[in-house]
Amino acid sequence: MENVNTVKLGLLTIMGAIGAFISKLFGGWDMALNTLVIFMAIDYITGLIVAGVFNKSCKSENGGLESRAGWKGICKKCMTLFIVLVAVRLELALGTTFIKDGVVIAYVVNEAISIVENAGLMGLPIPNVIKKAIDVLQKQGDEQ
């Protein structure tokens, strides 16, 4: 039992250190970055549902699940985070504080649009308040 607790503590320590490193790398884990990661996960999951359940994916030839399309989606999500990381480093180099926020807002809007598109492919009506919120975010991103 003591070995289990030691291993558990070791794993938690390693995970905490990795989390702290990633947070530091991204200039802190703020609400915007948290929102982006959540939206990325929702978009990926709803994309899987559109392909796997509804067979309406535009990412595959037959509209169904395809491992290559899923892998491309994961690669794009990783590249999005790399671009955010580039924005953070540019902020540090230039001594500004708005580049990361502008980039994150742009990607949040992109993910939100994709989530809404996935919902539409599932046959769900999209409330106007969601459409208006996306428009507001898009305008904020354009201003920055």
Task: Label each PLM-derived region with a short phrase.
Residues K8-G28:
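Alpha-helical phosphate/pyrophosphate-handling elements in metalloenzyme active cores
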Residues T13-G19, V37, C75-R89, V103-E111:
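Hydrophobic alpha-helical transmembrane segments of multi-pass integral membrane proteins
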Residues I22-L33, L90-I99:
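Helix-coil boundary and interhelical linker segments in multi-pass alpha-helical membrane proteins
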Residues D30-I45:
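Loop-to-helix transition at the N-terminal end of transmembrane alpha-helices
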Residues I42-S57:
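Membrane-water interface of transmembrane alpha-helices
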Residues S57-T80:
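Juxtamembrane helix-capping/reentrant segments at transmembrane boundaries
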Residues A93-L121:
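Hydrophobic alpha-helical transmembrane segments and immediately flanking/interface helices
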Residues A112-Q144:
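Canonical alpha-helical transmembrane segment with a positive-inside/aromatic-interface signature
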